[in-house]
Regions:
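ABC family nucleotide-binding domain
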Residues: 2-203
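Single conserved hydrophobic/aromatic residue that forms the stacking wall/gate
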Residues: 204-222
Length: 222
């Protein structure tokens, strides 16, 4: 479904070049729950950004459903991000003065579907993440765990093939983190879910060894 072939990414600042990704090769399957482990600065978020089309790679290839992205134009990346990828971050990125239903709808602004369909998809997504009784509330009326559920609903609303999660439990307490992880794990039964974390203890609770890749040691064998 998704494959990275010898992906390299460099950043140059003030004449100094840093290797963020140095020849990463790994393949992911649909209905897989994958953890990318490593400390801050090891390249985890860079890898997630490359997979999500938020950042360009310098060499190698990203293969999506058997298709190379080497010659992708910006319009191709836009279509990929809008239709195939759902992003979940540590920060909820919710607009405080709008209701959570409107927040979820905003994620579908560029999808080209009608207002009525956006509203229905948003409602369905919020119900799916367990917020049926909170649909008409604003973010300020919710707990941290509930706000992260809104963010997950926003990522789900367009029914993407891939969910990319960057430290999704980083701002939550231990009990709430486990609840959110259980929800994300459930979603992996029908989607490819790739999660970045620097917390090996949390990862080892939810991931089998073969689906946890240690980016620090560049061990990309499956």
């Amino acid at each position: 479904m998704l494959e990275l072939k010898d992906i390299k990414k460099y950043y140059t600042v003030g004449g100094t070049t840093t290797k963020a990704l140095d020849g990463v090769s790994v393949a992911f399957r649909k209905q897989e729950f994958v953890a990318i482990l490593g400390p801050s600065g090891s390249g985890k978020t860079t890898m997630l950004n490359v997979i999500g089309g938020l950042d360009n790679y310098d060499s190698g290839d990203l293969i999506i459903n058997g298709k190379s992205t080497k010659n992708f134009k910006e319009a191709d990346w836009d279509a990929y991000r809008n239709n195939s990828i759902g992003f979940i971050f540590q920060s909820y990125n919710l607009i405080s003065h709008q209701g959570i239903l409107d927040n979820v709808e905003l994620g579908m602004t560029l999808s080209g579907i009608s207002k009525a369909e956006r509203r229905q998809k948003a409602e369905d997504a919020l119900i799916r993440v367990g917020l049926k009784d909170h649909i008409h509330k604003k973010p300020s009326q919710l707990s941290g765990g509930q706000m992260q559920r809104v963010a997950i609903a926003r990522a789900l609303a367009n029914d993407p093939d891939i969910l990319l999660c960057d430290e999704p439990t980083g701002a939550l307490d231990s009990e709430t983190s486990l609840q959110i992880m259980a929800l994300i794990q459930e979603l992996s039964k029908e989607k490819l879910v790739i999660m970045v974390t620097h917390n090996p203890e949390l990862a080892h609770v939810f991931f089998k060894q073969k689906t946890a890749y240690e980016i620090l040691d560049r061990d990309w064998s499956s």
